[in-house]
């Protein structure tokens, strides 16, 4: 992803590059000088050429000869690119006197008033979102900062302005030549009619003469000259340098952490300048190594223990033979970077283009290309065979993962003993890791046709305004008749399309597959790519029209149909998915578990050029087979070989040839070149590369995460089996293992790709354990690095190829600012730079407009036309109107008709759906901080509106968020209209079907359509927008919009002066802006921007507008912060303890908030999904989802929606509609304005958000499950997190804080009402249709379905046949549906958000739902289905059981135990219940065909209905076979002939949320208080004479939680009753928190409770708030976070209730100790108290700290002795509820070591029961192992409890027995457990009391899911288990 174009993927950028190059030098006619350039040459758009290359070009040569005659120039006087660069960046003479160029500019700039307004605007805008700057940020402070920074970069500013002026004046030249004079009254600028050059006087001895292609300079007594592209290059670079220097100096002044200082920046730039000064053009070889060097410097900081050669990239870059002459400069850079951190190096990394570009050696590039192409490839046949097999493995497994069945295939030689063949036959999931997997078995598996070429793919599908190559005959004609290769009609694809016959791509591609292409079309032009640093030109390709049609179409097929089955390829990912994947891959390097992840960066040698047919065939033949055309892709390299290839950029000496078009001379043109060509088969070659990489990874048994696009392949490999020491560092043995694996893997990569014929650069294929770099995005140790400088460098007005209108220039600034903020931490410095840049655009538009000054002198408009009260007014304007003009240009909004500036809220966020409320709320907020009352008044009017006298509903339908303002059309709108006018009236279009289609562009007819579409009383504009887009009007307008290159528009409209028309529109627009606010507006804002926006829409369009107005959080919400836990009705955001710059430099424990796209909650029907492949139908088909979602089926509006489909196909529309029961999700939230995804994404580096934990659940008034309201939650969270993040990042030393986003404006949030169809249905009865036109109509017989669509439709029909239940709201309960959902989540078949599970938890009976889930789990196991559908994750059950009521009911019913739990992280329960077959109950199980795995649901439903079926082996075999089959109709019988099924199961189709959300919310969450006994007296115990070193605790220290709990409860209750306590501190453990709450509820006490929270959970929900809601209200209000309030707590009156794993002591003098927490008292001086009577056998003490007392350890020991002597009060215990009947607080164990309730061991039956329970617990761990470390610790806990219980019940003296070694050995998956405990046996093993766990297969390893196969041995003595470090 390129930060210049952040929304484009690499392929799109390549296409963008080719567009730019393709429009160069197309015109060669004699009158070329009189034809205005469409876009102008404002910046470098092509590679720099040498003089020899340029003079071969006829146009340049003509200009050169003219310059020779007029100026006497010669080749020796020509400046090199480096000389021009030096002139522009450091030697430009600045003369500020009037009469010289800069002086004339400066005097005019200085004459423009109100520059100081910028300073006021900047400080006001910053204050809107940065509260920490409220005090010191003033206009004078901003001015001081700007002036100080400007003084440091004065030369760069002045030089930038001079050269931008030179470039702008140069682009006036064609127009001024027509007039024969300059239109400027500047003394420094003259037009010389004789030479037709502009003369510019820069200084007394510096004069510039500029022509169309040559710039002559008189500097002193020297006359020098340079081609204009050299000047463009220099002008670009001086502008870029000014931007980055200003930005760095600004960051210095603002003290931005981890910045590149201006001093350091200048040093870095100086090294490159010195290099170019010393080496000239050859210096670019050194500049080209800059990026690699900086990456190598970061890599050199890797862990040398892990990375075999961490200095590889740095060393090879410095020692590269090509860098020998310039190594000094590389070493200087190396030394400069030595003291920089990775953030700063990454920032400097973006400067790689700051030194410009070399003059390329075109012939050298051609020779290099042909040299690589001539290499004969003889790849190993074994590798080719393995690649074919690997492709099948990857495609088949991925296809099955997506569709749950395999692709259509043929097994030529079926082998019954082949695991692969069996899996394919039975539709079972393939696992390549099983022992029976035999890779060569793929050889007998052949792919068949699975995908269709859509019928409606035709000329229009690929119609784009792109450059093409002429065909052979066309090229021969132009060379023969005009001795040139150029001709616009032959070079523009759009023009060619108009004259082509109708081409259906399905037939076209079939013809190519069968016969190839005609020779006339086999021609490829190559041209040098621009903006490269390589001296030898890198050549891109232009193809003939049909050749391009073939490549574009087949690549589109791969993109649309195939790439989704290769998730490793990122070419088609959206921005958010790309960002998340980069975070995921880079974050693996910091996991810190029993593995280590390293990142490989692969650098191929000329990747494209190395490709050959023999290399690609193993993959390409199979790709073709998937489309039923085996040669479709395999013919690629045959076409290359048979094509004539020529240099198409004009520098070659070409001769016409009637056969080849151009005579192949072996220099400038050639044939027989089979090698790949840049950009022509990127997707296919990428698939091949990825398949090869995964093949290599398989050999090394490592997990691979791959990100690939083209030759940029980055992969992370995870090496398992690592061991870490106590501080988390890898041990030496593990480091050696990792190094060895990395070396082997690296060598295998190099060897395999070398043998294949795709060599890697061994010196630059580097590996790192910290640095991840993909597409210029850099991550270090999992954190994205700040690197805004590359994007900042391009923030200037003349930065792209658009027409330079005011609006486009401001958009250039806005795009650059948004791209820069994406790699920046916050927007403060960008507010400075954007405001000053907007001001400069506004100034230049008045004194030197790039467009209007072509035709008129630069002067202020004398009037502007506005509208008031429905009438147009001509308002005179003067310089007094400039203040409002400048304000509009710096703060305006395109939605209001202003220039499209960005405001700070827009910069930091992408995706907010309503630009109008965004603007209005920002202006309202900013207005408060403006100091100057005059400016405040002007800014106020930016939110006022006057409406247009006319109503053009087409504008509203095209942009539903628009308002009908009075601004005139301008810029691109004019171009679009000219394109439409041409297509409407063109005579060039010889294709009758196209001409028929273009007739729809008639303005009158189209206006009638839009008027009818908007004829309703109220306008549901989002729906109307989609309807219009789905009609032929929208389709045809889409074609017209593709003609977007101005050069094409100019060529099409030969009789219209395109630029003059655009210039007149621009003049009108500037006049409008100056006049806009001179009169009172029609409409003024109210106090609420949401109300204002709605009024503006309703009144301007003269009808109510529905569904687009969304309140902005800037006005809707008030941001507050507190250091105390006060729970407001608000969105809440907790911070951790990190603040200051550390917040940017570290990763917290919270979940990084990356935003989200809001997706639709239901899918289209299967038939709709299938028809959606057709280009013509896609929008209309997608629109059908609105029926029964937005409008009921049968309504008039639904008929109009159906009409859109009926107008373009004869298919029956009924199959495209979902029933209301299947539809869920609110239309207004889930459907984007354009019908695409919507949502919100932070546009800044989001690493600091990991230091926060936020939740929207706390916004009780607007929380989940409530009313449907117009809240954009993503923007609320982004707004809150950004403000909190910037504040904490700017102020070091802050305590933990809580931030709140609280509702501020009571009018902003409103409930969204469903539209009234009576009011919203338009009077539209027909839509245009063009039956018989293949471009606009498709008959259903021509729609061919992909194989998976055929299967889905068949399944859907069968499922419809199965359905026997219509939902009436009662026949299936919410608990039944929840049980089904939980089961599908358990097996990984259904992904449901955590927030939805919380909604489920609040409504259903958890125990009932769990029973339905368990029934399915147990039945699946009994039927043998668990191997096909294993349990994947139990997190959904843990979340569901997270309330007291739920855990209580499930504990009583299923004996589920709580293993651990915290306030923040939620609970973790014992999942061994999933393996208890005795819990199966007789209950009917329903089937919901809307959910996944319908055959599995049916199988379980049938099994549940018949006990006979469960016990009959034949029935089981039948049922077992069903879920693996692709079709259902063959299996109407589910039982053997001897058994009959009971009544058919309940089968329905409904969205689950319909059932669950309708259940009433349960608000009562009572805490039970089982012990109501009175407190008892606490008494002091005595010391006992025991040595501390030898002190041992008696058996009851290790009593079960059941026995400890009652006593702990009584102890805490007695303490709170007898001691004056003001604060209660409780560790973050759910059990303890709820126990404390129960005690206070029992005592009727209200006491501040402080939770000692350790860290964030890192999940999408915030458990703290949800758990808090479960406490009683009187306790809930007193709960706070300890660390936020510790300064308020008085230690002497505070009591701490700790949990055993606490490592940090808190400030409390009273401690309640229990169980293992006795260790906390070991070194504490103080006294110990115990209750005078006890409630149970468990131990609990109160420890009172006393610094004057001795250590309390002996008193603790004394307490134990006293406890042993006291009698247990059985009567008291029996008089109260026993623990097993309590809620989560009191009934469930916290840890397995205290929580396993074993039966007494005295009987064989008891021992057997214990063994079975232990086995189920270990199996539950085996089913969900996670990392091996957590699996091992889980096993240790369970086995520890087993052994402890064994000794406690079988041996009299536990401590004595524990002194013996007790070994535990675990191998393999478990099949049985044999406990051996015989103290009298003569057998050593039995006497040593080993516990044996039998393994399932002889010698087989225990296999951890998704991990390297390994064997785990646990050999630990009991004392190690007891006393070793505890990590849960």
Curated annotation (Swiss-Prot):
Protein keywords: ATP-binding, Host cytoplasm, Hydrolase, Methyltransferase, mRNA capping, mRNA processing, Multifunctional enzyme, Nucleotide-binding, Nucleotidyltransferase, RNA-directed RNA polymerase, S-adenosyl-L-methionine, Transferase, Viral RNA replication, Virion
Pfam families recorded: Mononeg_mRNAcap (PF14318), Mononeg_RNA_pol (PF00946)
InterPro entries named among the record's database cross-references: L_poly_C, Mononeg_mRNAcap, Mononeg_RNA_pol_cat
Ranges where the RdRp catalytic domain occurs: 596-782
Subcellular locations according to the entry: Virion; Host cytoplasm
EC number: 2.7.7.48, 3.6.1.-, 2.7.7.88, 2.1.1.375
Reaction equations catalysed: RNA(n) + a ribonucleoside 5'-triphosphate = RNA(n+1) + diphosphate; a 5'-end (5'-triphosphoguanosine)-adenylyl-adenylyl-cytidylyl-adenosine in mRNA + 2 S-adenosyl-L-methionine = a 5'-end (N(7)-methyl 5'-triphosphoguanosine)-(2'-O-methyladenylyl)-adenylyl-cytidylyl-adenosine in mRNA + 2 S-adenosyl-L-homocysteine + H(+); a 5'-end (5'-triphosphoguanosine)-adenylyl-adenylyl-cytidylyl-adenosine in mRNA + S-adenosyl-L-methionine = a 5'-end (5'-triphosphoguanosine)-(2'-O-methyladenylyl)-adenylyl-cytidylyl-adenosine in mRNA + S-adenosyl-L-homocysteine + H(+); a 5'-end triphospho-adenylyl-adenylyl-cytidylyl-adenosine in mRNA + GDP + H(+) = a 5'-end (5'-triphosphoguanosine)-adenylyl-adenylyl-cytidylyl-adenosine in mRNA + diphosphate
Gene Ontology CC: one annotated term: virion component
Main location: virion
GO molecular function: ATP binding; GTPase activity; mRNA 5'-cap (guanine-N7-)-methyltransferase activity; RNA-directed RNA polymerase activity
UniProt family annotation: Belongs to the rhabdoviridae protein L family.
Assembly with partners or alone: May form homodimer. Interacts with the P protein.
Function in brief: RNA-directed RNA polymerase that catalyzes the transcription of viral mRNAs, their capping and polyadenylation. The template is composed of the viral RNA tightly encapsidated by the nucleoprotein (N). The viral polymerase binds to the genomic RNA at the 3' leader promoter, and transcribes subsequently all viral mRNAs with a decreasing efficiency. The first gene is the most transcribed, and the last the least transcribed. The viral phosphoprotein acts as a processivity factor. Capping is concomitant with initiation of mRNA transcription. RNA-directed RNA polymerase that catalyzes the replication of viral genomic RNA. The template is composed of the viral RNA tightly encapsidated by the nucleoprotein (N). The replicase mode is dependent on intracellular N protein concentration. In this mode, the polymerase replicates the whole viral genome without recognizing transcriptional signals, and the replicated genome is not caped or polyadenylated.
Name used for this protein in its record: RNA-directed RNA polymerase L
Organism: Taro vein chlorosis virus (TAVCV)
């Amino acid at each position: 992803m390129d930060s210049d174009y952040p929304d484009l993927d690499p392929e799109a950028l390549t296409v963008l590059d080719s567009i730019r190059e393709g429009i160069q030098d197309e015109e060669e006619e004699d009158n070329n000088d009189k034809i205005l350039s469409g876009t102008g040459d404002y910046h470098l758009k092509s590679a720099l050429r040498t003089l020899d290359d340029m003079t071969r070009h006829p146009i340049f040569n003509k200009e050169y000869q003219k310059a020779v005659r007029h100026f006497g120039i010669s080749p020796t006087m020509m400046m090199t690119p480096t000389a021009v660069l030096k002139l522009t960046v450091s030697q430009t003479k600045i003369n500020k006197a009037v009469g010289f160029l800069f002086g004339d500019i400066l005097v005019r700039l200085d004459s423009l008033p109100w520059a100081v307004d910028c300073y006021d605007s900047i400080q006001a805008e910053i204050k809107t979102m940065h509260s920490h700057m409220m005090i010191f940020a003033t206009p004078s402070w901003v001015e001081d900062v700007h002036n100080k920074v400007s003084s440091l970069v004065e030369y760069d500013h002045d030089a930038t302005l001079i050269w931008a002026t030179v470039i702008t004046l140069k682009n006036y030249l064609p127009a001024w030549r027509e007039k024969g004079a300059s239109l400027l009254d500047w003394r420094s600028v003259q037009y010389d009619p004789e030479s037709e050059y502009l003369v510019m006087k820069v200084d007394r001895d510096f004069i510039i003469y500029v022509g169309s292609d040559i710039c002559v300079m008189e500097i002193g007594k020297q006359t020098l000259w340079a081609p204009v592209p050299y000047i463009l290059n220099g002008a670009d670079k001086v502008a870029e340098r000014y931007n980055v220097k200003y930005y760095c100096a600004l960051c210095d002044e603002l003290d931005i952490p981890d910045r590149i200082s201006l001093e350091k920046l200048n040093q870095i730039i100086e090294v490159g300048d010195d290099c170019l000064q010393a080496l000239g053009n050859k210096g670019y070889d050194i500049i080209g190594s800059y990026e690699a060097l900086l990456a190598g410097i970061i890599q050199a900081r890797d862990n040398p223990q892990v990375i075999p050669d961490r200095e590889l990239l740095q060393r090879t870059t410095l020692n590269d033979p090509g860098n020998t002459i310039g190594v000094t400069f590389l070493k200087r850079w190396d030394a400069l970077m030595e003291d920089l951190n990775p953030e700063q190096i990454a920032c400097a990394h973006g400067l790689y283009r700051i030194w410009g570009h070399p003059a390329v050696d075109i012939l050298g590039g051609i020779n290099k290309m042909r040299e690589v192409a001539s290499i004969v490839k003889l790849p190993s046949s074994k590798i080719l065979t393995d690649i074919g097999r690997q492709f099948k493995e990857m495609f088949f497994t991925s296809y099955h993962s997506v569709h749950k069945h395999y692709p259509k295939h043929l097994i030529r030689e079926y082998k019954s003993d082949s695991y692969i063949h069996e899996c394919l036959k039975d539709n079972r999931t393939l696992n390549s890791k099983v022992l029976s997997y035999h890779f060569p078995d793929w050889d007998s598996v052949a792919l068949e046709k699975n995908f269709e070429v859509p019928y409606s793919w035709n000329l229009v599908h690929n119609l784009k305004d792109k450059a093409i190559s002429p065909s052979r005959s066309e090229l021969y004609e132009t060379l023969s008749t005009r001795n040139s290769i150029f001709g616009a009609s032959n070079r523009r694809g759009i023009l060619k399309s108009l004259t082509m016959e109708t081409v259906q791509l399905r037939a076209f591609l079939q013809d190519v597959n069968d016969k190839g292409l005609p020779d006339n079309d086999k021609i490829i032009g190559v041209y040098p790519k621009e903006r490269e640093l390589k001296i030898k030109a890198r050549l891109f390709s232009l193809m003939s029209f049909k050749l391009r049609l073939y490549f574009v179409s087949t690549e589109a097929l791969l993109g649309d149909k195939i790439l989704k089955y290769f998730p490793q390829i990122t070419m088609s990912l959206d921005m958010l998915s790309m960002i998340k994947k980069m975070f995921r891959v880079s974050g693996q390097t910091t996991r810190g578990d029993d593995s280590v992840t390293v990142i490989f960066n692969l650098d191929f040698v000329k990747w494209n050029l190395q490709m050959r047919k023999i290399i690609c065939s193993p993959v390409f033949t199979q790709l073709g087979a998937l489309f039923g055309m085996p040669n479709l892709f395999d013919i690629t390299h045959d076409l290359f070989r048979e094509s004539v290839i020529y240099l198409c950029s004009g520098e070659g000496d070409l001769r016409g040839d009637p056969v080849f078009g151009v005579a192949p001379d072996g220099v400038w043109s050639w044939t027989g070149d089979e090698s790949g060509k840049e950009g022509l088969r990127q997707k296919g070659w990428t698939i091949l590369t990825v398949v090869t990489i995964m093949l290599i990874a398989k050999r090394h048994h490592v997990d691979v995460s791959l990100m690939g696009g083209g030759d940029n392949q980055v992969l992370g490999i995870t090496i398992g089996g690592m061991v870490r020491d106590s501080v988390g560092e890898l041990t030496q043995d593990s480091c050696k293992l990792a190094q060895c694996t990395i070396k082997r893997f690296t060598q295998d990569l190099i060897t395999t790709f070398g043998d294949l014929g795709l060599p890697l650069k061994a010196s630059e294929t580097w590996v790192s354990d910290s640095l991840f770099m993909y597409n210029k995005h850099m991550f270090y140790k999992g954190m994205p690095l700040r690197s805004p400088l590359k994007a900042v460098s391009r923030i200037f007005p003349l930065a792209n190829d658009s027409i330079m209108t005011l609006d486009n220039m401001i958009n250039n600034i806005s795009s650059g600012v948004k791209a820069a903020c994406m790699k920046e931490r916050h927007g403060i410095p960008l507010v400075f730079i954007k405001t000053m840049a907007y001001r400069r655009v506004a100034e230049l538009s008045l004194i030197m407009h790039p467009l209007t000054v072509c035709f008129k002198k630069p002067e202020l408009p004398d009037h502007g036309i506005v509208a008031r009260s429905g009438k147009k007014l001509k308002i005179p304007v003067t310089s007094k109107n400039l203040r409002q003009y400048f304000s509009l240009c710096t703060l305006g909004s395109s939605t209001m008709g202003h220039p499209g500036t960005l405001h700070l809220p827009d910069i930091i966020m992408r995706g907010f759906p309503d630009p109008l409320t965004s603007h209005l709320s920002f202006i309202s907020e900013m207005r408060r901080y403006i100091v100057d009352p005059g400016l405040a008044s002007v800014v106020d009017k930016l939110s006022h509106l006057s409406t247009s006298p006319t109503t053009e509903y087409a504008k509203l339908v095209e942009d539903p968020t628009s308002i009908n303002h009075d601004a005139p059309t301008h810029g691109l709108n004019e171009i679009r209209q000219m394109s439409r006018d041409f297509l409407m009236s063109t005579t060039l279009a010889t294709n009758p079907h196209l001409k028929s289609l273009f007739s729809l562009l008639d303005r009158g007819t189209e206006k009638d359509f839009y008027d009818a579409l908007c004829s309703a009383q109220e306008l549901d504009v989002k729906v109307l927008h989609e309807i219009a887009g789905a009609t032929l009007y929208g389709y045809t307008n889409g074609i017209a919009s593709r003609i977007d290159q101005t050069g094409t528009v100019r060529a099409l409209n030969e009789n219209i002066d395109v630029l003059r028309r655009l210039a007149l529109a621009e003049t009108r627009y500037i006049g409008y802006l100056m006049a806009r606010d001179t009169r009172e507006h029609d409409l003024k804002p109210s106090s609420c921007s949401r109300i204002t926006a709605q009024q503006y829409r309703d009144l301007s369009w003269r009808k109510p507008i529905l569904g687009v107005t969304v309140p902005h959080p800037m006005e809707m919400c008030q941001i507050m912060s507190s250091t105390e836990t006060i729970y407001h009705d608000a969105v809440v955001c907790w911070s951790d303890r990190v603040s200051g710059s550390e917040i940017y430099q570290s990763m917290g424990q919270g979940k990084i908030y990356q935003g989200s796209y809001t997706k639709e909650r239901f899918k289209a029907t299967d038939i709709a999904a299938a028809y959606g492949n057709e280009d013509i139908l896609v929008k209309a088909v997608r629109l059908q989802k609105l029926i029964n979602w937005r409008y009921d089926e049968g309504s008039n509006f639904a008929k109009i929606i159906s009409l859109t489909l009926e107008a373009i196909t004869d298919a029956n529309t009924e199959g495209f509609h979902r029933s209301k029961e299947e539809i869920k999700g609110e239309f207004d939230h889930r459907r984007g304005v354009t019908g695409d995804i919507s949502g919100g994404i932070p546009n800044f580096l989001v690493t600091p958000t990991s230091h926060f934990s936020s939740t929207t659940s706390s916004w009780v008034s607007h929380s989940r499950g409530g009313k449907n309201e117009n809240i954009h939650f993503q923007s609320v969270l982004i707004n809150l997190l950004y403000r909190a993040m910037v504040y904490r990042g700017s102020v070091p030393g802050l305590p933990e804080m809580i931030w709140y986003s609280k509702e501020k404006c009571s009018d902003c949030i409103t409930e969204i009402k469903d539209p009234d169809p009576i009011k919203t249905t338009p009077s539209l009865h027909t839509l245009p249709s063009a039956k018989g036109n293949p471009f606009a109509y498709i008959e259903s017989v021509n729609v061919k379905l992909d194989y998976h669509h055929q299967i889905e439709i068949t399944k859907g029909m069968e499922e419809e046949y199965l359905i026997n239940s219509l939902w009436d709201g009662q026949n299936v309960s919410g608990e039944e549906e929840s049980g089904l959902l939980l089961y599908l989540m358990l097996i990984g078949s259904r992904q449901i958000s955590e927030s939805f599970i919380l909604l489920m938890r609040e409504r259903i009976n958890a125990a009932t739902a769990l029973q339905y889930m368990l029934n399915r789990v147990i039945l699946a196991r009994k039927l043998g289905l668990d191997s096909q559908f294993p349990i994947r994750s139990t997190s959904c059950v843990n979340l569901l059981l997270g309330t007291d009521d739920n855990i209580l009911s499930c504990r009583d019913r299923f004996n589920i135990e709580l293993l651990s739990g915290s306030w923040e992280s939620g609970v973790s329960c014992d999942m061994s219940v999933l393996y208890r077959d005795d819990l199966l109950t007789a209950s009917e199980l329903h089937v919901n065909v809307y959910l996944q795995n319908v055959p599995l649901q049916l199988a379980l439903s049938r099994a549940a209905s018949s006990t006979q079926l469960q016990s009959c082996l034949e029935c089981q075999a039948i049922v077992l076979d069903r879920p693996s089959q692709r079709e259902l109709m063959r299996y109407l019988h589910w039982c053997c002939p001897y058994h009959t099924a009971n009544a058919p199961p309940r089968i329905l189709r409904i969205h689950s949320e319909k059932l669950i959300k309708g259940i009433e919310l349960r608000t009562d969450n009572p805490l039970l208080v089982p012990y109501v006994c009175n407190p008892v007296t606490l008494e002091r115990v005595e010391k006992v004479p025991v040595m501390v070193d030898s002190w041992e605790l008696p058996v009851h220290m290790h009593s079960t939680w059941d026995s400890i709990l009652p006593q702990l409860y009584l102890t805490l209750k007695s303490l709170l009753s007898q001691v004056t306590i003001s604060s209660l501190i409780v560790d973050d453990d759910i059990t303890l928190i709820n126990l404390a709450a129960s005690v206070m509820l029992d005592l009727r006490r209200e006491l501040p409770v402080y939770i000692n929270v350790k860290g964030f959970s890192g999940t999408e929900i915030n458990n703290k708030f949800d758990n808090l809601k479960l406490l009683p209200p009187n306790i809930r209000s007193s709960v706070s976070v300890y660390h936020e309030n510790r300064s308020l707590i008085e230690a002497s009156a505070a009591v701490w209730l700790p949990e055993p794993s606490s490592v940090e002591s808190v400030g409390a003098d009273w401690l309640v100790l229990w169980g293992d927490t006795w260790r906390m008292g070991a070194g504490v001086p103080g006294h110990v108290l115990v209750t005078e009577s006890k409630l149970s056998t468990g131990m609990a003490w109160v420890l009172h700290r006393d610094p004057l007392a001795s250590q309390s350890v002996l008193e603790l020991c004394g307490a134990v002795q006293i406890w042993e002597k006291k009698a247990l009060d059985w009567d008291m215990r029996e008089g109260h509820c026993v623990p097993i009947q309590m809620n989560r607080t009191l009934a469930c164990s916290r840890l397995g070591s205290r929580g396993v309730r074993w039966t007494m061991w005295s009987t064989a039956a008891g021992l057997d029961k214990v063994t079975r329970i232990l086995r189920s617990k270990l199996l539950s761990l085996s089913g969900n192992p996670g990392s091996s470390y957590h699996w091992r610790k889980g096993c240790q806990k369970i086995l520890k409890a087993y052994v402890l219980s064994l000794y406690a019940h079988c041996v009299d003296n536990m401590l004595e027995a524990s002194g013996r070694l007790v070994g535990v050995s675990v191998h393999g998956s478990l099949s049985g457990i044999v406990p051996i405990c015989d103290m009298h046996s003569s057998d050593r093993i039995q006497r040593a009391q080993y516990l044996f766990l039998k393994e399932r297969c002889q010698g087989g390893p225990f296999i951890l899911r998704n991990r390297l196969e390994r064997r785990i041995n646990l050999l630990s003595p009991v004392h190690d288990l007891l006393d070793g470090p505890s990590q849960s």
